[in-house]
A protein has these predicted regions:
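Active-site neighborhoods and metal-handling regions in enzymes and metal-associated proteins
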Residues: 1-173
Length: 173
């Protein structure tokens, strides 16, 4: 499956389709979900359409910092709540403490979204063989949203990223 949300509609998640041509300063979120032999994976990247500014630019920077913070501690024995807190700390540093997401990742397998959630109150520890997403995101109806999502396999010593799309700041220019 592939779909794309843009501008303020990103904040509402899976939205009804419409014809819209992005304008300079918009953010666009293409989402690719795959299913192979009964197992799911997802890969999402926010793309800056032209030059973004204000909350969109600040949120983009905070999401990239949150993503990096999650990946730094991604290994067996790390609690899901620790992953959440690592991302939340970066969101707060970026000035987004008032719109923290409920989760910054989730399990994935026979369904696209499964337990366990990478959430503040989940003390479950990562174990080898788990497949989860790392998907820090910030959403607000007034300016849209920014999210990067990768599917990862937890290994004995760390993780393997199963989705290989480029990371960092992405722009159509």
């Amino acid at each position: 499956q592939m779909w794309c949300l843009s501008d303020s509609r990103i904040a509402y998640g899976c939205d009804c389709s419409r014809s819209y041509k992005p304008r300079n300063g918009d953010v666009v979120l293409p989402m690719a979900w795959a299913k192979v032999d009964g197992y799911h994976a997802e890969n999402e990247r926010t793309i800056a359409w032209g030059q973004i500014s204000g909350d969109r630019a600040a949120a983009y920077k905070a999401v990239l910092a949150a993503r990096e913070a999650e990946f730094k501690i991604l290994k067996p024995g790390t609690a899901f709540s620790e992953l959440y807190q690592a991302a939340a700390n970066e969101f707060k540093k970026g000035g987004f403490g008032d719109i923290l997401p409920g989760r910054v990742g989730h399990g994935v397998g026979n369904s696209a979204h499964e337990y366990p959630s990478v959430a503040e109150d989940n003390t479950l520890l990562l174990q080898p063989g788990m497949v989860i997403t790392i998907e820090p995101g910030l959403m607000d109806a007034s300016w849209g949203g920014v999210r990067h999502s990768d599917t990862v396999l937890i290994t004995e010593k760390g993780y393997d990223r199963l989705t290989q799309y480029p990371n960092g700041y992405l722009s159509n220019r």
